Amino acid sequence: MKDLLIKYGYDKTENISNEWNYVKGWTDEFPYTIQQIHGIKGAIVTMSTMCIAQRTSLDMLMYYDTRPSTFNGVFDFYTAKPLKGYYAFYWYGMFYDMRAEIRAVNEIENIYSLCGVDENGKVLAIVTHYSDNDNTENRTISVDFGKSGEYEIYLLDEKHNGELVQITDKLEFDMKVHSAILIKEK
C-alpha cells in the first residue's frame, strides 16, 4: 500500500488500516461474526493481525471497537470485564518495552508471530495459530532463538486467559487452531 501512495504522490500520507475486526459476513453469517468477535477466534484474529501488520508499512492499525458495542471483543458489554481479545492488546503492549524486532525466518501457513528483544538481550515472542476454518488441525511448531535459555509460556485459548502454563527450555508446541502463546525469556 505504501508503494501505491508514493507512486501517486502521497509519500507524506499516513498509511492507516481503520476500523478492522473479524467479519465472516454481513448477512446470514453476521450472528456468527458477532459470536466470534467476543470469543477466542476473534482474539486470535486480532493477535494475528497485529503480528502481520508489524511487518508492513502501516503507520496505524485501528481496531474497531472498544466502545460498548457488538464489535467490542476486548471488554464485556455489561460487566466491562476482559474478554479473550483483551489479551491480544495486553500482550502486544509488552513489545513497547522491546529494543528491537526479530523477524521470523520461516513462514508457516496459518502461523503468525511477533518477536522482540529487550535491552538485556531477553526475548519476548508471540505465536498464533489462526484459520477461518474452525476444523483446522493442530500444528506442531518449533521456535529457535539461536540460544538456550529458560522461558515462561503463557497460553491464550478456549480454556486459558493468557496465563502462565509452564516454564521450559524446550520450545516445541502443539498448537490448536485459534490459540496463541507468549514466550518470555526468564
PLM features: residue spans?
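Aromatic/acidic polysaccharide-binding cleft in carbohydrate-active enzymes
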Residues: 17-113, 119
